[in-house]
Amino acid sequence: MKKNLLLIAILCIPFIANAQQKLTSPDGNLVMTFQVNKEGAPTYDLIYKGKTVIKPSTLGLELKKEDNTRTDFDWVDRRDLTKLDSKTNLYNGFEVKDAKTSTFNETWQPVWGEEKEIRNHYNELAVNLYQPMNDRSILIRFRLFNDGLGFRYEFPQQKSLNYFIIKEEHSQFAMAGDHIAYWIPGDYDTQEYDYTISRLSEIRGLMKEAITPNSSQTPFSQTGVQTALMMKTDDGLYINLHEAALIDYSCMHLNLDDKNMVFESWLTPDAKGDKGYMQTPSHTPWRTVIVSDDARNILASRITLNLNEPCKIADAASWVKPVKYIGVWWDMITGKGSWAYTDELTSVKLGETDYSKTKPNGKHSANTANVKRYIDFAAANGFDAVLVEGWNEGWEDWFGNSKDYVFDFVTPYPDFDVKEIHRYAASKGIKMMMHHETSASVRNYERHMDKAYQFMVDNGYTSVKSGYVGNIIPRGEHHYGQWMNNHYLYAVTKAAD
């Protein structure tokens, strides 16, 4: 909920084509310079208290070569291919059409968080760029806060740019030195790596050791790292590279040119290798550079929250509540218990497999008596909820088979009494937290989502932890691609409904 709007000032800058544009943070400590270089490529740099944070870096995108006017049976002539080559270019050949600056200052209240109110104060530069060779326009919007920079690309609706596919995003972040970095390997499917602390120049040599086994992983480069990336410079600056407002777009990783110390955005591809399907008018997420000479200010920064879209769930504050919970899962991870009800089945077909005819393995952790023990512990020790994994049929062959119909999210094992557990938890003042492991079969989860959420409502579950262990189905998609990011938001929207 936004409130206390203090000042909005807009200034249209008279300009000479491709002249430098300077933007200063409200406190004057950060200065960003934008210009179009001699190749017509947009560039920017960033300085904090006289120290270089980002050296001159180019911006832009490369589109996939395609011609929507042709069919697969049309004859393609070489001259047409040359035209298509030029149409993929959204990274140079630009001239500045106009530039506008503005100032914004407000306080707003988050749904929940560490602070009751957050200040959103920045100076903005919006640069409208025109590309004569393709008769196209894009806008790059910069917002400079006291603690860092955010920028994004915006694509107005226009005759020469309607539907397009992103092949690569070429947002660069040129470092001013061989900084110390706190990094994990760039990967399209997992962030479950231990952090490595090293110089940027050492990333390549340490990458092989840093990539440890995981249930689903797709590392992409010997110098690729994930955001948020934290760095420390030799002259006492702390720099964080990340993104905000990630909606209908792929997650951004960073690929390092370790000869020149230049990071470039690296988007997660889809099953076809494409990195984003776009329709104008639209825009990318924000790319963020948080900077301070005090490490504590990086943690205190609210740039990401300020650049995220406002909450669109009108009554969220009335039902979104943080909780402390414990759960039935760690004894399975340590091998003392199991998610599976029986050891007799190597293959399960939901609706056909009859668990009443199988022998229990005696170590199934998600049983009524054991869950009651956890409820008692939660009630005695100040916890709000109990999560139970392995409660529903299908865990005997849930992983590693690329199985589509793996769970139905509503059928409990014979030893898990849903009604009794809810009654007992309520008598102790404890909420039960639902667990929906999808085994990364996202298509199956979306088919069952309405029934699964209604099952929760009918049985007193007010929250859900969803899991996506394994390789994504539809096969070839990745955990951090555009398709999956849209799924995560779809799940949140359905839960709110």
Regions found by a protein language model. Name each.
Residues 279-373, 381, 385:
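An acidic-aromatic substrate-binding cleft motif
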Residues 153, 378, 467:
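Conserved, mostly hydrophobic/aromatic
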Residues 22-315:
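N-terminal accessory beta-strand-rich subdomains and adjacent acidic, glycine-rich linkers
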Residues 152, 287, 327, 387, ...:
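Structured core elements
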Residues 389-497:
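Aromatic- and carboxylate-enriched substrate-binding clefts and catalytic-loop regions
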Residues 146, 166, 281, 319, ...:
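Active-site-proximal structural scaffolding
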